[in-house]
Each structure stands twice: as structure tokens, then as C-alpha cells.
């Protein structure tokens, strides 16, 4: 009985991944892979295949810990939270994709126009950060993978 209680307590205190990441809800300088986001806040989830979820998680934690610009705040189960430069980065690893949320700590003014090629109004710094992270880990946005399969 005592062993069962100790096990229950240990499981209750073990780090838990959230079921999902919170939405940007119109915040400036925030992107998310939540499909309900407005287009200027949406970025496709990242696929980590052919890696397993455990390997993808280990690689991501290692990369973020080794990056001098990042401080890992939480790495529970399949969830990672880090402060990278001026952004809070959250990664939630599902079976075959990584969902994410990247939000600036200090919100800036989002201009109502773009001056860069392929710009989507707002949150370009956060888009570049998550795409660079994915590239370094060998992950790709699921929409680019799907488009490549159709070509």
C-alpha cells in the first residue's frame, strides 16, 4: 500500500507536458502552429521524421542547451520551453510533428506592410527563429513536405 502511494505521488509530481500550447490571441510578435490562428500568426508544424519522438526531443533539448543565446526553462516529458534572445520558445512534440509557439518577451509595433521578400505581415523574427531551429535539427514544416510529395 505504501509503495503504491509513493508511486502515485511520484507520478503526480513528475513533469507533465501540457495537452496543447496556448494561442497567440492577436498578440504582436507571436507565431504558433495552432491551425486556428490568424494567417499572420500561423506557421505550419515541423515534421521530425524519420526520427523517433524521443530522439527528436533529446536533439532539441541538447541544441537549445548548447546555444549560448538560449536558456532552457522547462524540459518535461515531450514539452520544452526556452528563452532564446528576446523570445519565449515552446515546443510540444507529438507522435510525428512538433507544435510550437514563439512569442517575443517585449512586444514591438507591427508595421502594416512588409519590405522583405516572402514576408507575412508581422512576427518575422519569430518565423525566422523557428525555421532556423527546425533546419538545424533536420526538421521541416509539414506544408513544405506535403508540397514536395505532390511535385
Model feature map: region roles:
Residues 1, 8-12:
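N-terminal chloroplast transit peptides
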Residues 13-151:
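Ser/Thr-rich, low-complexity intrinsically disordered terminal regions
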Amino acid at each position: 500500500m505504501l509503495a503504491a502511494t509513493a508511486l502515485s505521488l511520484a507520478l503526480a509530481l513528475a513533469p507533465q507536458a501540457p495537452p496543447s500550447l496556448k494561442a497567440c490571441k492577436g498578440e504582436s510578435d507571436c507565431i504558433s502552429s495552432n491551425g486556428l490562428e490568424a494567417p499572420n500568426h500561423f506557421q505550419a508544424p515541423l515534421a521530425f521524421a524519420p526520427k523517433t519522438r524521443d530522439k527528436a526531443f533529446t536533439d532539441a533539448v541538447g541544441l537549445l542547451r548548447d546555444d549560448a543565446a538560449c536558456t532552457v526553462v522547462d524540459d518535461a516529458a515531450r514539452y520544452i520551453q526556452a528563452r532564446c534572445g528576446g523570445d519565449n520558445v515552446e515546443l510540444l512534440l507529438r507522435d510525428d510533428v512538433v507544435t510550437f509557439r514563439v512569442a517575443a518577451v517585449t512586444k514591438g509595433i507591427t508595421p502594416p506592410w512588409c519590405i522583405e521578400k516572402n514576408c507575412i505581415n508581422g512576427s518575422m523574427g519569430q518565423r525566422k527563429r523557428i525555421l532556423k531551429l527546425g533546419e538545424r535539427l533536420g526538421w521541416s514544416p509539414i506544408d513544405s513536405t506535403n508540397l514536395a510529395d505532390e511535385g
